[in-house]
Amino acid sequence: MTATPFEELGKALGFGSHLNPDMTREDVLLHLGKMPAIPANLGVAREEEFEYDGVRITTLSWKVGWGKPTQAFLLTPIDANGPLPGVLYLHSHDDLKEFGKEKVAQHQERQLPESAMWVRREHYGDRAPANELAKRGFAVLVHDCFPWGSRGFSLDELPPRIKEIHGTADSAEFENLSVMFESLSLNKYLSLYGATMAGILNFDDRVALEVAKSLPEISGPISVIGLSGGGCRALFLHATNPEIRAVVSTGAMATYASMLHEHITPHSWMFFPFDLASKGEWPQIGMISDTPLFVQYCGDDQLFTKEGMADAHAMLEKHDGGRGHYRGEFYPVRHSFTVEMQEAAFDWLAKHV
Protein backbone atom coordinates (compact mmCIF):
# COMPACT_ATOMS: atom_id res chain seq x y z
CA MET A 1 0.00 0.00 0.00
CA THR A 2 1.36 3.40 -0.99
CA ALA A 3 2.26 5.67 1.93
CA THR A 4 0.30 8.90 2.24
CA PRO A 5 2.10 12.26 2.26
CA PHE A 6 1.33 12.49 5.99
CA GLU A 7 3.01 9.14 6.66
CA GLU A 8 6.00 10.13 4.57
CA LEU A 9 6.26 13.44 6.44
CA GLY A 10 6.20 11.63 9.79
CA LYS A 11 9.11 9.44 8.70
CA ALA A 12 11.03 12.42 7.34
CA LEU A 13 10.65 14.21 10.68
CA GLY A 14 11.67 11.15 12.68
CA PHE A 15 8.30 10.79 14.40
CA GLY A 16 8.48 8.19 17.14
CA SER A 17 12.16 7.41 16.69
CA HIS A 18 13.61 9.46 19.56
CA LEU A 19 11.44 8.54 22.52
CA ASN A 20 12.64 9.46 25.99
CA PRO A 21 12.30 6.40 28.24
CA ASP A 22 11.92 8.64 31.27
CA MET A 23 9.24 11.23 30.54
CA THR A 24 9.01 13.55 33.55
CA ARG A 25 6.40 15.81 35.08
CA GLU A 26 8.52 18.76 33.94
CA ASP A 27 8.44 17.44 30.36
CA VAL A 28 4.66 17.29 30.42
CA LEU A 29 4.26 20.75 31.94
CA LEU A 30 6.65 22.20 29.38
CA HIS A 31 4.66 20.75 26.48
CA LEU A 32 1.34 21.80 28.01
CA GLY A 33 2.51 25.34 27.34
CA LYS A 34 1.78 28.57 29.16
CA MET A 35 -0.98 28.57 31.74
CA PRO A 36 -2.49 31.43 33.72
CA ALA A 37 -1.71 31.72 37.41
CA ILE A 38 -4.42 30.33 39.67
CA PRO A 39 -6.04 33.34 41.41
CA ALA A 40 -5.50 33.65 45.15
CA ASN A 41 -9.21 34.36 45.57
CA LEU A 42 -11.43 32.20 43.38
CA GLY A 43 -14.61 33.77 44.70
CA VAL A 44 -16.30 30.43 45.32
CA ALA A 45 -20.03 30.99 45.76
CA ARG A 46 -22.74 28.60 46.89
CA GLU A 47 -25.96 29.20 45.02
CA GLU A 48 -28.90 26.77 44.93
CA GLU A 49 -29.46 23.42 46.61
CA PHE A 50 -31.49 20.51 45.27
CA GLU A 51 -32.39 17.02 46.42
CA TYR A 52 -32.78 14.39 43.74
CA ASP A 53 -33.06 10.62 44.10
CA GLY A 54 -31.15 10.36 47.36
CA VAL A 55 -28.50 12.93 46.48
CA ARG A 56 -28.05 16.50 47.64
CA ILE A 57 -26.80 18.74 44.83
CA THR A 58 -25.34 22.16 45.58
CA THR A 59 -24.64 24.50 42.68
CA LEU A 60 -21.33 26.34 42.96
CA SER A 61 -19.52 28.95 40.92
CA TRP A 62 -16.03 30.42 40.88
CA LYS A 63 -13.81 32.67 38.78
CA VAL A 64 -10.59 31.39 37.23
CA GLY A 65 -9.28 34.84 36.28
CA TRP A 66 -10.33 34.87 32.62
CA GLY A 67 -13.40 34.01 30.61
CA LYS A 68 -16.79 33.25 32.04
CA PRO A 69 -17.27 32.01 35.62
CA THR A 70 -17.21 28.26 36.16
CA GLN A 71 -20.44 26.63 37.24
CA ALA A 72 -20.36 23.30 39.03
CA PHE A 73 -22.36 20.73 40.97
CA LEU A 74 -21.32 19.32 44.34
CA LEU A 75 -23.08 16.00 44.97
CA THR A 76 -23.30 14.28 48.36
CA PRO A 77 -25.61 11.65 49.87
CA ILE A 78 -28.65 13.27 51.47
CA ASP A 79 -27.90 11.53 54.76
CA ALA A 80 -24.20 12.48 54.79
CA ASN A 81 -22.86 13.48 58.20
CA GLY A 82 -19.46 15.16 58.08
CA PRO A 83 -16.80 15.36 55.37
CA LEU A 84 -16.51 12.58 52.79
CA PRO A 85 -13.85 11.23 50.42
CA GLY A 86 -13.78 13.56 47.43
CA VAL A 87 -13.88 12.82 43.70
CA LEU A 88 -13.43 15.28 40.85
CA TYR A 89 -15.62 14.00 38.01
CA LEU A 90 -14.48 15.22 34.57
CA HIS A 91 -17.18 15.33 31.89
CA SER A 92 -16.57 13.95 28.40
CA HIS A 93 -16.08 15.80 25.10
CA ASP A 94 -18.78 14.23 22.89
CA ASP A 95 -18.59 17.03 20.29
CA LEU A 96 -21.31 18.58 22.46
CA LYS A 97 -20.22 21.85 24.05
CA GLU A 98 -23.52 23.40 25.10
CA PHE A 99 -23.43 21.16 28.17
CA GLY A 100 -20.63 19.88 30.38
CA LYS A 101 -21.43 18.83 33.94
CA GLU A 102 -25.03 17.93 33.04
CA LYS A 103 -23.78 14.99 30.97
CA VAL A 104 -22.78 13.09 34.11
CA ALA A 105 -24.75 14.71 36.95
CA GLN A 106 -28.50 15.11 37.46
CA HIS A 107 -30.10 17.68 39.76
CA GLN A 108 -33.66 17.73 38.44
CA GLU A 109 -35.97 16.06 35.92
CA ARG A 110 -35.65 17.03 32.25
CA GLN A 111 -32.26 18.59 32.83
CA LEU A 112 -30.96 17.83 29.33
CA PRO A 113 -33.01 18.37 26.17
CA GLU A 114 -33.88 15.24 24.23
CA SER A 115 -31.39 16.29 21.54
CA ALA A 116 -28.56 15.81 24.06
CA MET A 117 -29.81 12.69 25.85
CA TRP A 118 -27.96 10.46 23.40
CA VAL A 119 -24.82 11.15 25.45
CA ARG A 120 -26.36 9.52 28.52
CA ARG A 121 -27.83 6.63 26.55
CA GLU A 122 -24.79 5.82 24.41
CA HIS A 123 -21.94 6.78 26.73
CA TYR A 124 -23.18 6.37 30.31
CA GLY A 125 -25.60 3.44 30.39
CA ASP A 126 -28.58 5.81 30.47
CA ARG A 127 -27.81 7.11 33.95
CA ALA A 128 -26.01 9.97 35.68
CA PRO A 129 -22.80 8.32 36.96
CA ALA A 130 -21.79 11.20 39.25
CA ASN A 131 -25.04 10.72 41.18
CA GLU A 132 -24.41 6.99 41.47
CA LEU A 133 -20.92 7.66 42.80
CA ALA A 134 -22.28 10.12 45.38
CA LYS A 135 -24.78 7.50 46.59
CA ARG A 136 -21.79 5.32 47.50
CA GLY A 137 -20.63 7.85 50.08
CA PHE A 138 -18.46 10.22 48.07
CA ALA A 139 -18.55 14.00 47.73
CA VAL A 140 -18.40 14.49 43.96
CA LEU A 141 -17.50 17.79 42.31
CA VAL A 142 -18.45 18.16 38.63
CA HIS A 143 -17.49 21.37 36.85
CA ASP A 144 -17.74 22.84 33.38
CA CYS A 145 -14.32 23.26 31.82
CA PHE A 146 -13.39 25.54 28.95
CA PRO A 147 -15.00 25.61 26.41
CA TRP A 148 -18.06 23.63 27.61
CA GLY A 149 -21.25 24.78 29.28
CA SER A 150 -20.81 27.84 31.46
CA ARG A 151 -17.16 28.13 30.34
CA GLY A 152 -18.14 28.07 26.68
CA PHE A 153 -18.99 30.64 24.06
CA SER A 154 -22.10 31.81 22.27
CA LEU A 155 -22.93 31.69 18.59
CA ASP A 156 -22.20 35.41 18.36
CA GLU A 157 -18.69 34.87 19.73
CA LEU A 158 -17.68 32.45 16.98
CA PRO A 159 -15.39 33.95 14.31
CA PRO A 160 -17.37 34.98 11.19
CA ARG A 161 -15.10 32.87 8.98
CA ILE A 162 -16.28 29.68 10.70
CA LYS A 163 -19.88 30.52 9.83
CA GLU A 164 -18.88 31.36 6.26
CA ILE A 165 -17.12 28.01 5.78
CA HIS A 166 -20.02 26.09 7.29
CA GLY A 167 -22.52 28.07 5.27
CA THR A 168 -24.87 28.89 8.12
CA ALA A 169 -25.01 30.74 11.42
CA ASP A 170 -28.21 29.04 12.58
CA SER A 171 -28.36 28.23 16.30
CA ALA A 172 -29.44 24.69 15.38
CA GLU A 173 -25.96 24.23 13.94
CA PHE A 174 -24.14 25.52 17.04
CA GLU A 175 -22.52 22.18 17.89
CA ASN A 176 -21.19 21.65 14.36
CA LEU A 177 -19.90 25.21 14.34
CA SER A 178 -18.24 24.76 17.74
CA VAL A 179 -16.45 21.62 16.52
CA MET A 180 -15.12 23.58 13.56
CA PHE A 181 -14.05 26.41 15.88
CA GLU A 182 -12.13 24.02 18.13
CA SER A 183 -10.42 22.34 15.19
CA LEU A 184 -9.74 25.34 12.97
CA SER A 185 -9.51 28.50 15.09
CA LEU A 186 -9.02 27.85 18.80
CA ASN A 187 -5.64 26.21 18.37
CA LYS A 188 -4.43 29.21 16.38
CA TYR A 189 -5.20 31.48 19.34
CA LEU A 190 -3.49 29.08 21.71
CA SER A 191 -0.45 28.69 19.46
CA LEU A 192 0.01 32.45 19.32
CA TYR A 193 -0.26 32.61 23.12
CA GLY A 194 2.23 29.78 23.63
CA ALA A 195 -0.54 27.63 25.11
CA THR A 196 -2.22 24.33 24.23
CA MET A 197 -5.74 22.95 24.51
CA ALA A 198 -4.50 20.30 26.93
CA GLY A 199 -2.80 22.94 29.08
CA ILE A 200 -5.84 25.20 29.30
CA LEU A 201 -8.04 22.25 30.25
CA ASN A 202 -5.45 21.16 32.81
CA PHE A 203 -5.55 24.67 34.26
CA ASP A 204 -9.34 24.62 34.63
CA ASP A 205 -9.15 21.17 36.23
CA ARG A 206 -6.39 22.16 38.66
CA VAL A 207 -8.48 25.16 39.71
CA ALA A 208 -11.37 22.77 40.35
CA LEU A 209 -9.06 20.64 42.51
CA GLU A 210 -8.21 23.71 44.57
CA VAL A 211 -11.91 24.42 45.00
CA ALA A 212 -12.56 20.81 46.01
CA LYS A 213 -9.83 20.95 48.64
CA SER A 214 -11.48 24.03 50.16
CA LEU A 215 -14.95 22.51 50.54
CA PRO A 216 -16.03 21.41 54.04
CA GLU A 217 -17.86 18.41 52.55
CA ILE A 218 -14.55 16.90 51.35
CA SER A 219 -11.77 15.37 53.42
CA GLY A 220 -8.33 14.11 52.46
CA PRO A 221 -6.75 13.76 49.01
CA ILE A 222 -9.10 13.83 46.03
CA SER A 223 -9.57 11.16 43.36
CA VAL A 224 -10.32 11.85 39.69
CA ILE A 225 -12.47 10.03 37.13
CA GLY A 226 -13.45 10.64 33.52
CA LEU A 227 -14.49 9.09 30.21
CA SER A 228 -12.98 9.92 26.81
CA GLY A 229 -11.95 13.59 26.89
CA GLY A 230 -12.56 13.43 30.64
CA GLY A 231 -10.29 10.39 30.77
CA CYS A 232 -7.61 12.29 28.87
CA ARG A 233 -7.87 15.19 31.32
CA ALA A 234 -7.69 12.71 34.21
CA LEU A 235 -4.41 11.34 32.83
CA PHE A 236 -2.93 14.83 32.62
CA LEU A 237 -3.90 15.46 36.25
CA HIS A 238 -2.35 12.11 37.18
CA ALA A 239 0.90 13.26 35.57
CA THR A 240 0.95 16.83 36.87
CA ASN A 241 -0.58 16.70 40.36
CA PRO A 242 1.06 14.27 42.82
CA GLU A 243 -1.47 15.14 45.55
CA ILE A 244 -4.26 13.13 43.88
CA ARG A 245 -5.41 9.97 45.70
CA ALA A 246 -6.37 7.78 42.70
CA VAL A 247 -7.36 8.14 39.02
CA VAL A 248 -9.79 6.29 36.75
CA SER A 249 -9.39 6.94 33.02
CA THR A 250 -11.89 5.32 30.66
CA GLY A 251 -11.72 5.19 26.87
CA ALA A 252 -8.64 7.40 26.59
CA MET A 253 -5.60 5.15 26.27
CA ALA A 254 -3.70 3.83 23.24
CA THR A 255 -0.35 4.54 21.61
CA TYR A 256 0.25 7.70 19.61
CA ALA A 257 1.54 5.55 16.75
CA SER A 258 -1.79 3.72 16.56
CA MET A 259 -3.77 6.97 16.37
CA LEU A 260 -2.15 7.64 13.01
CA HIS A 261 -3.60 8.04 10.51
CA GLU A 262 -7.27 7.14 10.36
CA HIS A 263 -7.75 7.74 14.08
CA ILE A 264 -6.19 11.17 14.51
CA THR A 265 -9.09 13.23 13.14
CA PRO A 266 -11.78 12.11 15.64
CA HIS A 267 -9.64 13.16 18.60
CA SER A 268 -9.52 16.58 20.19
CA TRP A 269 -6.42 18.75 20.35
CA MET A 270 -6.28 17.88 24.07
CA PHE A 271 -4.62 14.57 23.15
CA PHE A 272 -1.86 16.29 21.21
CA PRO A 273 0.08 18.91 23.20
CA PHE A 274 2.68 20.39 20.91
CA ASP A 275 5.62 18.01 20.36
CA LEU A 276 4.84 15.85 23.42
CA ALA A 277 5.27 12.79 21.22
CA SER A 278 8.96 13.64 20.87
CA LYS A 279 9.32 13.00 24.61
CA GLY A 280 7.43 9.76 24.80
CA GLU A 281 4.45 7.63 23.85
CA TRP A 282 0.99 8.47 25.17
CA PRO A 283 0.97 5.59 27.71
CA GLN A 284 4.00 7.15 29.37
CA ILE A 285 1.73 9.93 30.61
CA GLY A 286 0.47 7.31 33.08
CA MET A 287 3.97 6.30 34.22
CA ILE A 288 5.14 9.59 35.72
CA SER A 289 3.34 9.28 39.04
CA ASP A 290 2.91 6.33 41.38
CA THR A 291 -0.63 7.51 42.11
CA PRO A 292 -2.91 4.46 41.66
CA LEU A 293 -4.26 4.39 38.10
CA PHE A 294 -7.14 2.31 36.73
CA VAL A 295 -7.42 2.40 32.93
CA GLN A 296 -10.57 0.97 31.37
CA TYR A 297 -10.29 0.04 27.70
CA CYS A 298 -13.32 -0.24 25.43
CA GLY A 299 -12.38 -3.35 23.45
CA ASP A 300 -14.46 -2.34 20.42
CA ASP A 301 -13.65 1.37 20.70
CA GLN A 302 -14.21 3.09 17.37
CA LEU A 303 -11.72 5.83 18.33
CA PHE A 304 -8.72 3.54 18.94
CA THR A 305 -7.29 0.39 17.40
CA LYS A 306 -7.26 -2.88 19.32
CA GLU A 307 -3.51 -3.14 18.75
CA GLY A 308 -2.89 0.40 20.00
CA MET A 309 -4.83 -0.24 23.20
CA ALA A 310 -3.16 -3.62 23.77
CA ASP A 311 0.28 -2.11 23.25
CA ALA A 312 -0.50 0.71 25.69
CA HIS A 313 -1.71 -1.76 28.31
CA ALA A 314 1.44 -3.85 27.89
CA MET A 315 3.65 -0.78 28.31
CA LEU A 316 1.84 0.34 31.47
CA GLU A 317 1.81 -3.17 32.94
CA LYS A 318 5.51 -3.64 32.27
CA HIS A 319 6.32 -0.30 33.89
CA ASP A 320 4.24 -1.16 36.95
CA GLY A 321 6.14 -4.42 37.37
CA GLY A 322 3.61 -5.94 39.73
CA ARG A 323 3.72 -3.06 42.23
CA GLY A 324 -0.05 -2.69 42.07
CA HIS A 325 -0.08 0.97 41.05
CA TYR A 326 -1.66 0.20 37.67
CA ARG A 327 -4.76 -1.77 36.77
CA GLY A 328 -6.03 -2.22 33.22
CA GLU A 329 -9.23 -3.92 32.12
CA PHE A 330 -10.77 -4.53 28.68
CA TYR A 331 -14.52 -4.58 28.07
CA PRO A 332 -16.24 -5.79 24.86
CA VAL A 333 -17.98 -2.47 24.20
CA ARG A 334 -17.74 0.53 21.93
CA HIS A 335 -16.60 3.95 23.23
CA SER A 336 -18.59 4.24 26.46
CA PHE A 337 -18.68 3.98 30.25
CA THR A 338 -21.25 1.25 30.77
CA VAL A 339 -22.97 0.45 34.05
CA GLU A 340 -20.65 -2.56 34.48
CA MET A 341 -17.61 -0.34 33.95
CA GLN A 342 -18.99 2.28 36.33
CA GLU A 343 -19.51 -0.27 39.09
CA ALA A 344 -15.97 -1.61 38.64
CA ALA A 345 -14.54 1.92 38.72
CA PHE A 346 -16.54 2.93 41.79
CA ASP A 347 -15.55 -0.25 43.64
CA TRP A 348 -11.90 0.47 42.84
CA LEU A 349 -12.18 4.08 44.04
CA ALA A 350 -13.75 2.87 47.29
CA LYS A 351 -10.72 0.63 47.90
CA HIS A 352 -8.44 3.67 47.65
CA VAL A 353 -10.16 5.80 50.28
Predicted regions and their residues:
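C-terminal catalytic histidine-bearing segment of alpha/beta-hydrolase fold enzymes
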Residues: 320-353
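N-terminal targeting or regulatory segments adjacent to alpha/beta-hydrolase or S9 domains
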Residues: 1-58, 64, 100, 136
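Flexible loop/turn segments at secondary-structure boundaries
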Residues: 95-97, 148-151, 230-234, 254-259, ...
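Proline/glycine-enriched tight loop/beta-turn segments at coil->beta junctions
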Residues: 67-70, 77-87, 93-100
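Cap/lid segment of the alpha/beta-hydrolase catalytic domain
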Residues: 92-203, 213, 260-261
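The feature captures the conserved acid-bearing segment of alpha/beta-hydrolase catalytic domains
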Residues: 256-317
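Primarily recognizes the serine-hydrolase "nucleophile elbow" in alpha/beta-hydrolase
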Residues: 200-277
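Alpha/beta-hydrolase
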Residues: 88-90, 143, 250
